[in-house]
Amino acid sequence: MPTPLTGRSALVTGANHGIGAAVAIRLAELGADVAVTYLRTGDPSRSDDYNVARSADGSGTTAAIESHGRRAIALEEDLSDPAVPARLFDQVESALGPVAVLVHNASGWRKDSYAPQRPDAVGRTSAMVDRHSIDSQLHVDARAGALLMAEFIARHRSHKSTWGRIVTLTSGEGRQFPGEVSYGAGKAALISYTLSAAAEMASDGVTANVVYPPVTDTGWITDEVRDFVAGDVDHHHIAEPEEVAEVIGWLCSSAGRIVTGNVIRLR
């Protein structure tokens, strides 16, 4: 039986674990063939669930995609390299056909601050803002996101396609982000790129939206984080990656065809 994304191919970045993996699997459930990217960034000397997940390759995700009868490839790439987006699209097109769905989930997260001595709401400290923290964050979140979208639309037009979906992920709404200032700046830039894409690609049949998940349990949640969420009126609960993936799957389906140019906050 045809499903909403039957015959379409998707590219999901940062998909060896967590939200990215859940999104890739959800798109496969909806019928898409899926390419996933990953970069093993965990500390191999640590055995906690979060580091184990961050140290994984993409084989677990591709196996889950294939269990739904869909084709899958996993590509280990460092998105801080500006040559990677074009190469990714070449590889995905060769293996799965033109990319109709782009989900940019990868992040170059580093915790930096102008007041690094002050612990944040859950007791974590930061490093001082420097060129390394700025480059790590902006190169992966903002620049890679912008180049992936540019590659997407250039190929979309060359194939004379009339249907496309772009979803990027943020943490915040483009305002201040104390304690993680370069993270906030990278996500603010990504929001701007995505909303501009929504305006400029609408006539090509492409929707573009930003999803702002709640605190999500991708393996990093501690008792301190749970206590913070429970006592904060701005947060309703700690989400599972699959809950976020359901929303992104809906945006990527035909049901999301008139939803574009939004920052969609989930709680």
Language-model segment annotations:
Residues 55-56, 76-89:
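The beta1-alpha1 cofactor-binding region of Rossmann-like NAD(H)/NADP(H)-dependent oxidoreductases
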Residues 4, 96-97, 240-267:
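C-terminal substrate-recognition "lid" of short-chain dehydrogenase/reductases
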Residues 16-17:
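Conserved glycine-rich cofactor-binding loop
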Residues 45-50, 116-119, 182, 199, ...:
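A glycine/serine/threonine-rich, flexible loop-to-helix segment
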Residues 108-112, 118-133, 137, 157-189, ...:
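Catalytic loop of short-chain dehydrogenase/reductase
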Residues 202, 207, 259-261:
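Short, small/polar-rich loop/turn modules that mediate ligand/substrate recognition or access, typified
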Residues 32-60:
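Conserved glycine-rich Rossmann-like NAD(P)H-binding loop of the short-chain dehydrogenase/reductase
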